[in-house]
Each structure stands twice: as C-alpha cells, then as structure tokens.
Swiss-Prot record:
The keyword Translocase does not apply. InterPro entries: DUF3245. It comes from the Eukaryota. It comes from Schizosaccharomyces pombe (strain 972 / ATCC 24843) (Fission yeast). Keywords: Nucleus, Phosphoprotein. This is Uncharacterized protein PB1E7.01c. Residues 30-163 are annotated as: Disordered. GO terms for cellular component: nucleolus; nucleus.
Amino acid sequence: MEQKVSADVLLNKYQTSISITKNLINSWLGNENTSVSSDEKNDDPPLQARPPRLGLGASRKDQSENSWVTSKNEKLKSLPPALKKKIERQLQKKKEAEKIEGGKNHDNLKRKLNKVGDELNEQQSDTDDDDDDSKARITSRSKRANAQSSGFDIYKKLGKKKR
C-alpha cells in the first residue's frame, strides 16, 4: 500500500506548500513586508564535492612531492650539452664545498656551545653568590627589627614586669 514517491515529485510538493504558506503570511502582513522570496534569491549554495581528507584510506596526491626537483631536472635536460656539463660541474663543486664546510661548521658549533655553556655556568655561580648575600641581608634586617622597637613597646614590657 505504500507508494514509492520520486524525489522530484516530493520536492515539487514541498516547494508548493512553502509558497502557499508564504503567500498566506504575506497576505496577513500586508504589502509593506513583501520581499523577494528565497526561491528567487536562490540562497542555497551550490553543492560542491568535498576535498579528499588526510588519514587512513586517503588518496595519494596527483603530483609528486618533489615536483620542483623534477622540474629542475627537466630544465637541465633541455639545455645544450656544453651548458649542461658546466652546470653539473658547478653543482658538484657546491656539494663538495658543503661537505668540507660541514665538518668545519660542526667543530665551530661545538666550540660555540662550549663557550655558551661556560658563560651559563659563570652566571649561575654569580646568581648563587647573590642569593647567599640576599639571605644574609634578610636575616640581619630581622635581627635589627627585633632590636629596634618603638617607645610604646618599651612601656608594654614595663607594664608586664610590674604585674
């Protein structure tokens, strides 16, 4: 007994019922509040496909991640042979220089780190001395504060002794 209704028929029924209710409401409100209906405005955003997400089951990228490397290689292949050899030699020299400098840089970094570590140790010892000095000052202040009392305190002490 249940009838199968197609989506188009159902959509048309829905739109007609909405338009009837809007017309009825507009008739109650009068001509002042008439505005362009939402059907004419077409407020609904167009449906777009969702971009693929990362994670389990995600599709791979179409472009390779090293596309800039491949483009450089393609440019290098398209050059004349003499220029190609010259550029390759320059790249090899650059790599060799980086290897040599890499060892030097490593030693330089070790030296710099050792210097920084020594400076930090010196600063730490200086702050420890300052902490000791400040503790000594605080204890001497508290002793002086106890020794110095107002005149009223003296009368309090005398009053306690008389009783």
